[in-house]
């Protein structure tokens, strides 16, 4: 089983991202689970969401404490939250940032096995006209993890957002897939 933990802020779409990733994996015949964890429910407050993906039925219903993959939608969280808490050895960290690999590693409490960086905010602003990074970051997740195909992510996005909005969000995921830089550490 692969466990993914998303870190974002209220209003950024971390919960939607977790659900879309689960839908994409389900399309590929996997068993999935996606759910949020809310502390103080307000716009801008830290939000955590989770996705589990497996080849077998998933029976556990707890939060994810030892993720294989951590996805950070808001880079300012690197200064306030230990996003690598419980990260499995050799785990993958995916960060929406313009910063360098060295700058990001300096902020992580645990060194991942793989680090993926993409300016999902820049991509979202360019394509969507809004700094909502959840669909763009899923392109980075597809590239860095290989858990799902980009096409499955795009299909799931178009099912979540209809019409032109779905097309634009699918394009944002593709752009992020192409621009994500993955470092083996």
From Swiss-Prot:
InterPro entries: Oxidoreductase_gamma_subunit, PorC_KorC, Pyrv/ketoisovalerate_OxRed_cat, Pyrv_flavodox_OxRed_cen. It comes from the Archaea. It catalyses: 2 oxidized [2Fe-2S]-[ferredoxin] + pyruvate + CoA = 2 reduced [2Fe-2S]-[ferredoxin] + acetyl-CoA + CO2 + H(+); 3-methyl-2-oxobutanoate + 2 oxidized [2Fe-2S]-[ferredoxin] + CoA = 2-methylpropanoyl-CoA + 2 reduced [2Fe-2S]-[ferredoxin] + CO2 + H(+). It holds the Pfam family POR. Keywords: Oxidoreductase. GO terms for molecular function: 3-methyl-2-oxobutanoate dehydrogenase (ferredoxin) activity; pyruvate synthase activity. Its EC number is 1.2.7.1, 1.2.7.7. PANTHER family: PYRUVATE SYNTHASE SUBUNIT PORC. Heterotetramer of one alpha, one beta, one delta and one gamma chain. This is Pyruvate/ketoisovalerate oxidoreductases common subunit gamma. The lineage of its organism: Archaea, Methanobacteriati, Methanobacteriota, Thermococci, Thermococcales. The gene is porG.
């Amino acid at each position: 089983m692969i466990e993914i933990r998303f870190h974002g802020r209220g209003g950024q779409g971390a919960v939607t991202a977790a659900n879309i990733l689960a839908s994409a994996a389900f399309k590929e015949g996997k068993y999935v689970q996606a759910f949020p964890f809310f502390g103080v429910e307000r716009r801008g407050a830290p939000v955590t969401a989770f996705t589990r993906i497996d080849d077998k039925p998933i029976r556990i219903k707890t939060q994810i404490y030892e993720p294989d993959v951590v996805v950070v939608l808001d880079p300012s969280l690197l200064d306030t939250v230990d996003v690598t808490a419980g990260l499995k050895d050799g785990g993958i960290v995916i960060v929406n940032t313009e910063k360098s690999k060295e700058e990001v590693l300096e902020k992580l409490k645990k060194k991942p096995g793989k680090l993926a960086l993409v300016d999902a905010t820049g991509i979202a602003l360019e394509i969507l006209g809004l700094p909502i990074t959840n669909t763009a970051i899923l392109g980075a997740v597809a590239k860095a993890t290989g858990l799902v195909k980009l096409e499955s992510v795009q299909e799931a996005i178009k099912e979540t957002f209809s019409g032109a909005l779905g097309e634009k969000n699918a394009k944002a995921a593709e752009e992020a897939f192409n621009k994500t830089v993955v470092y083996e550490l």
